[in-house]
Amino acid sequence: MDADPGTPMMRQYRALKAQHPDMLLFYRMGDFYELFFDDAVAAAEALDIALTRRGKENGTDVAMCGVPVHNAETYLQRLIRRGFRVAVCEQLEDPEEAKKRKGAAKLVQRDVVRIVTPGTLVEDELLDARAPSFLAALAVEGDGDDAALAWLELASGHFRTLATTRTALAAELARLAPQELLAAESVIADPAVAQALSEWRDRLVPLEAHQLAAGAGAERLRRAYGVESLDGFGTFTAAELGAAGAVLAYVELTQKGATPGLQPLSSQTVEGRLALDPATRRNLELVEPLAGERGATLLAAVDRTRTAAGARLLVHHLTGPLTDLAAIAARHDRVEALVRDAERRRRGREVLAETPDLERALGRLGRSEEHTSELQSLSHI
């Protein structure tokens, strides 16, 4: 490969990279995704793969590394777990067809077809089936204490908001544990929320304040759901609308036009649930260990669920313990009914063991993609 900046290929690469400066660019070349320059250095170190030098630019060797297309998901998973965002650039035509053209027109047409980020994963190969994966956004209202969170699990379409306060923000973020957190640059720099955001610095995605505006958020929501009014979804604060709109805008950016399958948006409440600050959660080792193996957690000790959706629900229950006595008693009654009837419990576990991950299967069907395997799994229910 000639890496001279004047070649058509390098001009194409530079143009695509300029559009995604804060991401690694997987540039498709035949059976490999190639990375160049600083991207190559970062990826080679993160993936522990060979860093090579190929071609020159301005007399200097160009760093390069690559991963095979057929095994790309494995490498993407490792990069995402390290906190990278990756723009995947594909060949949009058969290279043999491109060769029939003359001159610079022989260059294979390429473009970024998806952006893979920690909070927008939908592929089974990249997700932990037994843990939620949230993209969240934080919005605040003026200089007061009011704030809001919105979060979406793109794989299942679960879309929620919560009106909260700056004071309670740390506890709510610890409960959600988002993979990515969108927030205005001014909010990130605000000393009043700095402590709450300190745990999530490596997951923050800074936005401009206007990207979390309530009016724009409401319009984006109406467009996404195909409605003229959001009244049927309930009542939302201005901050909730701004946060939810920012989540949708980020999804539209990363999915490159693919339509997400969204469940109805709803505003949540934390009434009846215990608020736990980050330090308390860590020390209790509810779902994450202080050190060592993941088996040293309360979740690992009590998880006997037979489905992925059940495991995610258990995480939800453990990270938001009930405080309402009536709700606790009702849960105890349900548990007692199953404990007393061993045969019903056995049959139920057998049925659940054969049940596919309905939430995420339906989420995939809701996106504008073909998923024959999802249809087949649902047909057996």
Which residues does each PLM region occupy?
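Basic, polar low-complexity surface loops/patches
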Residues: M1-R340, D357-G363, R367
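Cytochrome P450
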Residues: R175, R346-L352
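Active-site-adjacent structural elements in folded domains
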Residues: A300, R345-R346
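Alpha-helical structural elements of signaling/regulatory helical domains
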Residues: R344, R367-E370
